[in-house]
Amino acid sequence: MTSSHTTGASARQELTPILKWVGGKRQLLDFIRPLIPEHTTYCEPFVGGGAGFFDLQPKKAVINDFNQELINVYQTVKEQPEELIELLLRHREQNSQEYFYQIRALDREPEKYEELTPAQRAARIIYLNKTCYNGLFRVNSAGQFNAPWGRYKNPNIVSEDNIRAMSRYLNKSKTTIRCGDYREALKGLRKGAFVYLDPPYMPLSSSSSFTGYTASGFGQAEQIELKRQCDLLNKKGIKFLLSNSCCDFIEDLYSGYQIERVPAKRAINARADRRGAIDEVLVRNF
């Protein structure tokens, strides 16, 4: 079997996620990395900030997310890295509280927002993500970015080397970038593929649920449907690894599979007192 495990040591350059993302997996990489089996295609249907994907750098991959703005960022990095860098440098020059709210308000006027080019939209999201409070990408029920100004003295708005390296990798690898329902990304996968699933987590309390990345939520019914999709992958002989909250509901739901509890530090939370170490689970069928 041909392995799509990595791009190869000679071509490999370390890549850092371009966006800060709630539930980002950088804290869990040391646990996830040794578990990833040999595979022909790597699939990540809830790619988010892509910490695992960019760490692994598979030769052949399918990445997907429901968030259109996020996927537009990856498409722009792949296709227009220099234009993106130029726009981010302009944002950096003008960065201030007043400017932040001016850029944030662009999506309040749909007609004007639709006039933005994909590169302008991508630069806007990266700029807001780097300068908003605690790095929260959050939208309201109308789909408008609503995280407040972060008051950072010297935010890292643009990393030119990282954007260029990420663009080179996305163009060199056989990576399909999709936007839509995660189930569509799973269709057509064959035995030999490997799927890493990092869905919106099951909330541990009524106040801890964070589904602000898209205006639609991901509740108990969606978690049950996700388990059904995992069962379908298992029947096809496709290996999967899933991360989720460490709670009775998830452990009972996946009781037929291998479950490992791992400690994870949550750096991003709207409430400072909720940040810190908390157990999560890694579920796998191999």
Please report, for each region that a protein language model flagged, where it lies by residue.
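Short loop/helix-cap segments at secondary-structure boundaries that form the rim of catalytic
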Residues: 52-58, 187-189, 250-256
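Short, well-ordered beta-strand micro-motif
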Residues: 127, 282-285
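SAM-dependent nucleic-acid methyltransferase catalytic core
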Residues: 2-27, 35, 80-196, 200-211, ...
